[in-house]
Amino acid sequence: MSATAEDNARGAKPAGNFARTVSQRKRKRLFLIGGALAVLAVAVGLMLMAFSQDIRFFRTPADLTEQDMASGSRFRLGGLVEEGSVSREGSELRFTVTDTIKTVKVVFEGIPPDLFREGQGVVAEGRFGDDGVFRADNVLAKHDENYVPKDLADSLKEKGVWEGK
Protein backbone atom coordinates (compact mmCIF):
# COMPACT_ATOMS: atom_id res chain seq x y z
CA MET A 1 0.00 0.00 0.00
CA SER A 2 1.25 3.46 -0.78
CA ALA A 3 1.80 6.12 1.89
CA THR A 4 -1.21 8.09 0.70
CA ALA A 5 -3.45 5.03 0.75
CA GLU A 6 -2.27 4.23 4.31
CA ASP A 7 -2.96 7.81 5.42
CA ASN A 8 -6.43 7.67 3.88
CA ALA A 9 -7.08 4.34 5.61
CA ARG A 10 -6.16 5.87 8.98
CA GLY A 11 -8.50 8.83 8.41
CA ALA A 12 -5.81 11.37 7.58
CA LYS A 13 -6.90 14.17 5.29
CA PRO A 14 -5.15 14.66 2.01
CA ALA A 15 -2.54 17.46 1.94
CA GLY A 16 -4.71 19.58 -0.38
CA ASN A 17 -7.54 19.73 2.16
CA PHE A 18 -5.11 20.59 4.94
CA ALA A 19 -3.79 23.57 2.98
CA ARG A 20 -7.35 24.67 2.29
CA THR A 21 -8.35 24.56 5.99
CA VAL A 22 -5.21 26.50 6.99
CA SER A 23 -6.02 29.24 4.48
CA GLN A 24 -9.65 29.29 5.68
CA ARG A 25 -8.46 29.68 9.28
CA LYS A 26 -6.13 32.50 8.26
CA ARG A 27 -8.95 34.20 6.37
CA LYS A 28 -11.32 33.89 9.36
CA ARG A 29 -8.64 35.21 11.70
CA LEU A 30 -7.95 38.12 9.33
CA PHE A 31 -11.68 38.98 9.15
CA LEU A 32 -11.93 38.78 12.95
CA ILE A 33 -8.95 41.11 13.43
CA GLY A 34 -10.26 43.48 10.75
CA GLY A 35 -13.71 43.55 12.36
CA ALA A 36 -12.23 44.22 15.80
CA LEU A 37 -10.15 47.08 14.39
CA ALA A 38 -13.23 48.54 12.68
CA VAL A 39 -15.23 48.40 15.93
CA LEU A 40 -12.31 50.01 17.78
CA ALA A 41 -12.06 52.79 15.17
CA VAL A 42 -15.79 53.54 15.46
CA ALA A 43 -15.55 53.62 19.28
CA VAL A 44 -12.58 56.01 19.18
CA GLY A 45 -14.40 58.22 16.67
CA LEU A 46 -17.50 58.41 18.86
CA MET A 47 -15.38 59.26 21.91
CA LEU A 48 -13.59 62.04 20.04
CA MET A 49 -16.92 63.49 18.89
CA ALA A 50 -18.23 63.44 22.46
CA PHE A 51 -15.11 65.11 23.84
CA SER A 52 -14.92 67.74 21.11
CA GLN A 53 -17.83 69.58 22.69
CA ASP A 54 -15.96 69.90 25.99
CA ILE A 55 -12.64 71.10 24.63
CA ARG A 56 -13.40 74.76 25.37
CA PHE A 57 -14.20 75.56 28.97
CA PHE A 58 -16.85 78.13 28.01
CA ARG A 59 -18.11 80.46 25.29
CA THR A 60 -18.45 84.21 25.70
CA PRO A 61 -21.58 86.00 24.44
CA ALA A 62 -19.65 87.28 21.39
CA ASP A 63 -18.59 83.70 20.55
CA LEU A 64 -22.18 82.43 20.34
CA THR A 65 -23.75 81.64 16.98
CA GLU A 66 -27.36 81.19 15.93
CA GLN A 67 -26.71 77.44 15.91
CA ASP A 68 -25.61 77.52 19.58
CA MET A 69 -28.81 79.33 20.47
CA ALA A 70 -31.10 77.04 18.47
CA SER A 71 -29.50 73.63 19.00
CA GLY A 72 -30.57 73.10 22.61
CA SER A 73 -27.18 71.56 23.40
CA ARG A 74 -25.52 72.15 26.76
CA PHE A 75 -22.48 74.38 27.08
CA ARG A 76 -20.83 76.84 29.45
CA LEU A 77 -21.38 80.58 29.07
CA GLY A 78 -18.68 82.82 30.54
CA GLY A 79 -18.42 86.54 31.08
CA LEU A 80 -19.09 89.28 33.58
CA VAL A 81 -22.39 89.82 35.40
CA GLU A 82 -23.66 93.11 33.98
CA GLU A 83 -24.12 95.94 36.49
CA GLY A 84 -27.79 96.51 37.38
CA SER A 85 -28.98 93.29 35.75
CA VAL A 86 -29.45 91.01 38.78
CA SER A 87 -33.03 90.43 39.96
CA ARG A 88 -34.98 87.74 41.81
CA GLU A 89 -38.39 86.49 40.75
CA GLY A 90 -39.49 83.81 43.20
CA SER A 91 -36.86 81.08 43.15
CA GLU A 92 -35.40 82.33 39.85
CA LEU A 93 -32.30 84.48 39.69
CA ARG A 94 -32.19 86.60 36.54
CA PHE A 95 -29.06 88.36 35.34
CA THR A 96 -27.19 89.31 32.18
CA VAL A 97 -23.76 87.99 31.20
CA THR A 98 -21.61 90.27 29.07
CA ASP A 99 -18.18 90.31 27.49
CA THR A 100 -18.66 94.06 26.84
CA ILE A 101 -19.37 93.29 23.17
CA LYS A 102 -22.60 91.30 23.46
CA THR A 103 -24.93 90.32 26.29
CA VAL A 104 -26.97 87.21 27.08
CA LYS A 105 -29.91 87.04 29.49
CA VAL A 106 -29.60 84.18 31.98
CA VAL A 107 -32.14 82.54 34.29
CA PHE A 108 -30.86 80.37 37.12
CA GLU A 109 -33.16 78.50 39.47
CA GLY A 110 -31.41 77.90 42.75
CA ILE A 111 -29.10 79.48 45.25
CA PRO A 112 -26.23 81.39 43.64
CA PRO A 113 -22.66 81.00 44.91
CA ASP A 114 -21.67 83.23 47.84
CA LEU A 115 -19.30 85.26 45.68
CA PHE A 116 -21.86 85.92 42.92
CA ARG A 117 -22.39 89.65 42.36
CA GLU A 118 -22.63 92.29 39.66
CA GLY A 119 -19.44 93.15 37.80
CA GLN A 120 -17.79 89.85 38.70
CA GLY A 121 -16.72 86.92 36.53
CA VAL A 122 -19.18 84.06 36.16
CA VAL A 123 -19.50 80.79 34.26
CA ALA A 124 -23.06 79.48 33.81
CA GLU A 125 -23.72 75.95 32.57
CA GLY A 126 -26.96 75.12 30.74
CA ARG A 127 -28.71 75.64 27.40
CA PHE A 128 -30.84 78.16 25.57
CA GLY A 129 -34.60 77.93 25.99
CA ASP A 130 -37.15 78.48 23.23
CA ASP A 131 -37.49 82.09 24.39
CA GLY A 132 -33.81 82.85 23.64
CA VAL A 133 -32.90 83.06 27.34
CA PHE A 134 -30.00 80.96 28.62
CA ARG A 135 -31.34 78.50 31.23
CA ALA A 136 -28.50 77.76 33.65
CA ASP A 137 -28.61 74.81 36.02
CA ASN A 138 -25.18 75.55 37.49
CA VAL A 139 -23.43 78.87 38.15
CA LEU A 140 -19.80 79.29 39.17
CA ALA A 141 -18.45 82.58 40.52
CA LYS A 142 -14.94 83.91 40.98
CA HIS A 143 -12.88 83.25 44.10
CA ASP A 144 -12.10 86.76 45.33
CA GLU A 145 -12.52 90.35 44.26
CA ASN A 146 -9.38 90.32 42.06
CA TYR A 147 -9.85 86.91 40.44
CA VAL A 148 -11.16 86.41 36.94
CA PRO A 149 -10.85 82.96 35.35
CA LYS A 150 -7.74 82.83 33.13
CA ASP A 151 -9.73 81.65 30.10
CA LEU A 152 -12.16 84.55 30.51
CA ALA A 153 -9.34 87.09 30.95
CA ASP A 154 -7.55 85.74 27.86
CA SER A 155 -10.75 85.83 25.83
CA LEU A 156 -11.50 89.42 26.90
CA LYS A 157 -7.88 90.45 26.17
CA GLU A 158 -8.19 88.99 22.65
CA LYS A 159 -11.26 91.15 22.07
CA GLY A 160 -9.43 94.21 23.42
CA VAL A 161 -11.91 94.83 26.24
CA TRP A 162 -9.90 93.59 29.25
CA GLU A 163 -8.56 96.31 31.51
CA GLY A 164 -7.31 94.08 34.33
CA LYS A 165 -3.92 92.53 34.97
UniProtKB/Swiss-Prot annotation:
Residue intervals on the Cytoplasmic side: 1-29
Entry superkingdom: Bacteria
One GO cellular component this record assigns the protein to is:
plasma membrane
Tell me the GO BP annotations in alphabetical order.
cytochrome complex assembly
Membrane-crossing segments per the record: 30-50
Q: List where in the cell it is found.
A: Cell inner membrane
In the UniProt record, does the keyword Cell inner membrane occur?
yes
Q: Which InterPro entries match?
A: CcmE, CcmE-like_sf, NA-bd_OB-fold
The entry sums up its family as follows:
Belongs to the CcmE/CycJ family.
Function of the protein: Heme chaperone required for the biogenesis of c-type cytochromes. Transiently binds heme delivered by CcmC and transfers the heme to apo-cytochromes in a process facilitated by CcmF and CcmH.
Official protein name in the record: Cytochrome c-type biogenesis protein CcmE
User: Which species is the source of this protein?
Assistant: Brucella anthropi (strain ATCC 49188 / DSM 6882 / CCUG 24695 / JCM 21032 / LMG 3331 / NBRC 15819 / NCTC 12168 / Alc 37)
